[in-house]
Amino acid sequence: TTGILVGIGETRWDRIEALEAIATSHARYGHVQEVIVQNFLPKPGTAMHNAPACPPDEYLDAIALARVILPPEIHLQAPPNLSDDFGVLLDAGIDDWGGVSPVTTDHVNPERPWPALELLTSVTVERGFTVAPRLTAYPEFVCDPNRWFDKGLHFAVMDRSDAAGLGRDDPGAVFPEAIETVSAADGAEVRQVGSESTAWYSGAPVRPVHLV
């Protein structure tokens, strides 16, 4: 992952050169998953707290430049919480919203809350796209673990991803293990598994959920 910050005094040509440098590096190593194009917003207590925010038209132009200059396999990300009208970011060329969370704040920009997932999904679908969860690694990299991951990470990555390399929709996150020791009628102790547990076994009263 790499990226550029737009609106800190650089010129349009500076942005073009930065994006071309990223494209050149990727052509050599094939290692760039995504490029984040972020608009500068002044923050209190910093050296640039009085600097103007990045103009929206310059920001959208930078995103469009990135989409034209970078090869199509490099994903383009922009944070939705730093733009009041984040739908136009899709129009400009992004294909990823980044780490949007319904339970945590943006720790870098806590004053800018994430948009509700329902709104984010609605705006995305209106433009003909689909919202899907992913890991920190993109599907193209997840599906080629021998090249991109240390062997010690293979199980963890594959356990948390689906057949397409996206984030796995695992019912275990909703229904945690529910196992307790009880006494049977004959006095023997047995391990009783709850009806909503993710521990499946022969003769279970419920069928496993299809994850893939």
Language-model segments: which ranges?
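Glycine-rich beta-alpha junction loops
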Residues: V6-G9, N39-L41
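Auxiliary Fe-S-binding modules of radical SAM enzymes
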Residues: I16-V212
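Radical SAM/AdoMet-radical enzyme domain recognition
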Residues: T1-T2
